[in-house]
């Protein structure tokens, strides 16, 4: 299966390169690609940093009504998919974990987060 690559160009000149894994979270990857291909992620600042925990790229749907949607938790829809571990160096889709909903928002964990496994698609 093809693994799309997304590159975030930071204002300081650094790049963050993300390999997307559609076999692990097909709907979530499609949601991210939708937002990226329509420019909804362009020129967006980091929304918040929770020291020692994660960096949120958005918790306000990037300010676009087109991204204010929710998709069901990947693992409820696809129970055969083994959830991946959340740890530094990966990207996780944000949303409302306890409600089992996500969107195109995402965050970078700054620590191992075993409590995220099966809640936030990695």
List where the protein language model places each region.
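Cyclophilin-like peptidyl-prolyl cis-trans isomerases
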Residues: 1-122
């Amino acid at each position: 299966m093809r693994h799309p690559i997304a590159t975030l160009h930071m204002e300081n000149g650094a790049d963050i390169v993300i390999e997307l894994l559609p076999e692990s979270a097909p709907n979530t990857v499609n949601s991210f690609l939708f937002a990226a291909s329509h420019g909804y992620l362009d020129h967006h600042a980091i929304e918040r940093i929770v020291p020692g925990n994660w960096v949120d790229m958005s918790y306000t749907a990037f300010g676009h009504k087109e991204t204010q949607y929710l998709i069901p938790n990947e693992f409820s829809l696809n129970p055969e998919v083994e959830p991946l571990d959340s740890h530094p160096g990966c990207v996780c889709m944000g949303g409302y974990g306890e409600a089992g909903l996500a969107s195109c928002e995402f965050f970078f964990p700054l620590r191992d987060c075993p409590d995220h496994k099966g809640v936030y698609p990695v």
